[in-house]
């Protein structure tokens, strides 16, 4: 089973909802999805570090600039030598400048799913299990775009 750590910006409802949905959907894809432990005290908790250590992939969908907790989690994942993918909305400034972090920018109005999946496949290798991970990340992007469309129509 592939384990994925999904981080999100706190106080950004769309990102938090997406992370929770992905955690639920992960079971359908036979993926272990972990989220950060952000209950109680601030700072990077041991439980979050353990979840990152267990992960094969670190994933963030960013609709806003990355917050300090997310950047701290990314930095920890770097020290743990994890594959890291940050999927940015085109309107968000990429506030990381770390070559080991794979940043994918998307434009919900212009980009097609093949572009995003192609970028993801550059990061992950080519096994059947990795095809599942790529599909899972694409589902996450679809959910994020759907949430954006829904919020604009309100």
Please give the residue ranges for each predicted region.
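Conserved N-terminal substructure of TIR/SEFIR domains
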Residues: 1-57, 147-154
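A short helix->loop->beta-strand "cap" motif at the edges of active sites that frequently abuts
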Residues: 80-92
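Short, well-ordered alpha-helix to beta-strand connector turns
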Residues: 55-56, 81, 100-102
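C-terminal interaction surface of TIR/SEFIR-family domains
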Residues: 94-154
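Short beta-strand/turn micro-motifs composed of small residues
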Residues: 7-8, 62, 88-89
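Short acidic, S/G/P-rich loop/turn micro-motifs used as interaction or catalytic elements
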Residues: 11-14, 39-40, 64-68, 92-93
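Short, well-ordered beta-strand core segments
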Residues: 58-59, 84
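Conserved TIR/SEFIR loop-to-helix hotspot centered on a Trp-containing motif
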Residues: 64-81
């Amino acid at each position: 089973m592939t384990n994925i750590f999904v981080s999100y910006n706190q106080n950004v409802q769309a990102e938090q909802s997406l992370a929770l949905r992905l955690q639920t959907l992960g079971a359908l894809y036979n993926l272990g999805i972990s989220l950060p432990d952000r209950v109680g005290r601030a700072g990077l908790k041991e439980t979050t570090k353990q979840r990152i250590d267990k992960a094969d992939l670190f994933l963030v969908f960013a609709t806003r600039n990355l917050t300090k907790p997310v950047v701290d989690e990314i930095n920890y994942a770097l020290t743990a030598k994890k594959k890291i993918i940050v999927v940015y909305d085109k309107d968000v400034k990429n506030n990381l400048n770390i070559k080991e972090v794979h940043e994918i920018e998307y434009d919900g109005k212009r980009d097609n799913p093949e572009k995003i999946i192609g970028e993801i496949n550059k990061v992950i290798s080519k096994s059947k299990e990795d095809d599942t991970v790529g599909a899972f990340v694409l589902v996450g992007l679809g959910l994020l775009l759907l949430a954006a469309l829904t919020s604009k129509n309100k």
